[in-house]
Amino acid sequence: MDDVATRIEHTVLGPTTTPGDVQAVLDTAIETGMRACVPPYCVSMAAEYAPGVELTTVVGFPHGQHTTANKADEATALAEEGADELDVVANLGLLRAGEDESFRRDLAEVVAATTRPVKVIVEAPLLDEDEKHRAARLATEADAAYLKTATGFADGGATVADVELLSTYLPVKAAGGIDSWEQATAMFEAGAERIGASSGDAILEE
């Protein structure tokens, strides 16, 4: 169970998330050994409050349509504030428009802006099969460390099929609608290395 806990990022990223909500997630992470994924504005507080917890935050969240310079600056700042890993949202507008090099460069500049591992959120529920492959290939070429299935804000969540597809390119963080031990197990069996879930504590309690 301890090994499973270290592969779960207990997540709190809702639009009304308070510092108190983040502290509650961190308390659970401390107790269970889970990682935590918190909003950018709480990174500094979280790093000070729970220095032993592996801390992830998000960049360009939730739509990925910030300018590349803004994303890169955000990544640099959040790493300096204490984030151990960064989940950056890909710009799907560029992908959908067929501007593959611009899509890749947007991600590559974020990766280059920090020494922290960068996971690229491809928002798989919004993509067709060709777009999933292109997004995964281009993120790989941008030197991403992981692919992440979704932000959790789009309709549809993580699927076994998407994890299987994406894991042929890079390690995968499955996220979006995972709230049970059965779902988590299915994602791990499909090849996910990590899971992001707002119900991390409930998953471990089953």
Regions found by a protein language model. Name each.
Residues 9, 46, 78, 120, ...:
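Conserved, mostly hydrophobic/aromatic
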Residues 61, 80-94, 141-159, 174-206:
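Glycine-rich phosphate-binding active-site loops on the catalytic face of alpha/beta enzymes
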